[in-house]
Structures are given as C-alpha cells and as structure tokens.
Amino acid sequence: MWDAKVDRAPVLALTGQVQTQVFGPGAFQDIDLKSAFEAVSKFSQPVLTTSNHAELMTLACKSAIVERDVAHLIFPDDVQTIPSDAKAGSPQGRIGEDVVVPSEDALEAASDLIQNAKRPIIVMGHGAVSARNAVIELAERLGAPVMTTFKGKGLIADDHPNAAGVLGRSGTPIASWFMNESDLILSLGSSFANHTGIDRSKPIIQVDFERMQLGKFHPVKLPIWGEIGAFCRAICERLDPRSDDRQVKELTERWAMWREEKRTRLAEERGQGVSSVALFDVLSELCPADAIIAVDVGNNTYSFGRYFETTGQRVLMSGYLGSIGFALPAAMGAWAATQDVAEFAGRKVVSISGDGGFGQYPMEFATLVKYGMNITHVLLNNAELGKISKEQRAGEWPVWETNLHNPSFAAYARLCGGHGAKVTETADLKEAIATALNADKPALVEVTTDAELV
C-alpha cells in the first residue's frame, strides 16, 4: 500500500476485524487497525452495524479515485454477515469532471516562451499518462524531442521520430544531450525527482493538475495549473507547426550513435555471464508492442531503462518507493486486468527482475500456475544484490553480505508446473525468450548475467 500511496495509485483496502463485542479489550487478533493504517491511508473508517454502509463505501471509493490514494474500510466479523437491502452507491453526481483548463494568461505566457525558443524539449512524466497522445501531438507540432522520466518510460515509443528515450540515471545519452542543448524545458507531469536529471538552471514551463507539484522543489520560470492534455491542445491551437525539423534530424543521428555504442558494449562480455545489453536487445526485438511490462528494482531496472527500446509497451514500476520484489506481483495484477478490462484484453504480460527481486515472492510462481496466468518472467541472475554491491563500491566500503546462494530458478519454475529455461550463453537468448513468450502457461527464463555489465 505504501507503493500505491507514493506512486499515487488509487487503492480500496478492505480489512477484517474481530467481532464488535470483543473489539477493544485486547481479544485474540484484536488490533487497532485504524491506527495501524493511519499513516498510509487518506481515508480510514470502521464499518459498524449501524453505519450507513453504502455512504461509507461511496466515500472510500471517492477518496481513492479523487485523491489517488489509499482508502481503507474495516469490517468486523459480525458486520460482514449482516443482510441488507440498501441500495448501493453510485458515482453519478458524486465526482465532477477532472479536466482543469489552464488560464488564458498562463497559456499566453507559455505560447510566448515556446514561440521564442530555438531548441525546446519536452520532459514527459508518468503524470501525463492519460494525456500522452496530446503531448506527442504537441511535440510533433514543435519539432521537439520528447524524453520521459524513468517512471514515464514507454509513454512515447522509442521508434517515434520525436522520442529521445529516458532522462536521468536510468536513461540514454540521447536524452542527456538534448537536455544540455535545450533552451526551454516543458515539464509535463514530472515530479523533478533527484534521479531524473532535469537541468534546473534552464527556463522551465511546468504543467501539472496538482498545484502542490508546481515548483515543489525549486522555482520554475512558469508554473501552470491545469490538466496536461488540455494544456497541450490549447497550445497547439495557438502555435503554427514549425518548419524547422533540425532537432528531429538530430534525434535520428543520436539514436544511430547510441545503437552503435550499444554494439560496442556487447563486445565487453568477459565470460562471466550474459551482457544485459544483449538481453534487452533481444527482448526489444521479441516483446509484443502492446505488452504490459512490470520491472523490479536494482541493476536489472537500470539496464532496462537504458537498453530496452519501447515500441508501445506499457511499463509498470515501483517509481518512488523502489520496493524490491515489485515486478511479479505487479504483473499478476496486470494479468488480472487483461481478463477484466477491455482496454487490456489479450495483451501479453511480462515481468523482469533480478535474482534478489524474484527471491522476495518466489511462491507466487506457483500461484501463476494455479490460476493459469501465462506471464513470462525474465530473471537476471548475477548471484548477488548487484545494485547494493555497486553502491558499496562507490562509497569505497567493503562489499558485504550481498552475495546470494540461489537454487536453479528454471528448475523451480518447472517443478511448479510452468515452463523454465536457463540461458548462460548469448547465442541461446533469442530462442529461449521467444519460446517463453509463446508458451501457453507461466514461463520463466533465467539468464546468468555479469553483475558489473549494467
């Protein structure tokens, strides 16, 4: 739930409780759940026999959706079995439109800044997820590169002419170069996290539908309160398309340079495991364009951010809490959405983790088999908590207690009833991943990787 809270993902948490007649004195399993959930939940209430049950549920749902936070209801055992003929609540008349159009003054000021900029760029964060098409349309009109935050990876496909990849520590030199060369930054739905690498010395137009996010960490040239899609559409109406396609041509050149650099890095294999460059090159080639990809934390995630080239995939990650073990449970949730939500029906679900991340929830692979969740899990096994080792070396400390004693994860997947394959040579990657992606049951590909080739 803390993951959901800091990533602003709505959650409705329903928890049980002992019967009301023994609640409070300290009976078996009697815990003050309201206090326990107080810090993580925006709304938390016990549901009693005399409560207005439909109204409490309506308020909980509204709090989760509007606040994009955790809402929590506590159900004592006896309340759960009370018969009721009360009418269920409805969102009708309870939630207004969520489109906030920026003021005319703000739009005019933004238009002037953009019109006078020679090298504008767009930084698209996860806050622009529902407005990504409008952002891309604006970028095309301006001839501007679009780089994403790491959490926003995939919001624009890397094969789009205006795409510049991910900005920051998990990103590409393409995005960094355009950031350095820019004379105006349009930040759309980005929180300015310290990993992102936005140059604060440059003029910034920041647009967000949450006023607290505007200039949150430092002043910006022009903070604009409004829905990002509404802003982009309004600016497109004010500005003529640019005839200068210089930056788009430079993007083509920079991508060619980066791909050549990746080929150079492929040659750095030291015989101590498969290079993550090779792995994500193959996955970029084979992963369906409409797939949903859940990534974990650690070196595997940094490599995914740099080397995986999106073609339309939806990416899920623990963006702000950085919870190790996130990928597989998130993939399970995404798979459930493919069964229930028309927008996601039929889409392939892939999860990516290191050995440390998979080790947090290994029994969930048996759950995949039990429920027929044909998720493909790609596991980078370097036999250590590689990110922690890297941080210890960077701090000039001894590398301490980061090595892992692992079983054969591929064999474990097979014992659970799924498909399991182990790859130790780059030449075997493509066939192994293709087979796993096409399996009609849960599949795991364990790839022995070099911890130092990130």
Give residue spans per PLM region.
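Flexible, glycine/charged-enriched surface loops at secondary-structure junctions
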Residues: 70-72, 242-255, 269, 444
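Thiamine diphosphate
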Residues: 14, 22-29, 215-217, 222-225, ...
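Active-site diphosphate/adenylate-binding microenvironment
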Residues: 256-342
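Generic enzyme active-site microenvironment
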Residues: 206, 294, 352-353
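N-terminal alpha/beta PP-like core and its mobile active-site loop of ThDP/TPP-dependent enzymes
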Residues: 1-243, 286-289, 346, 367, ...
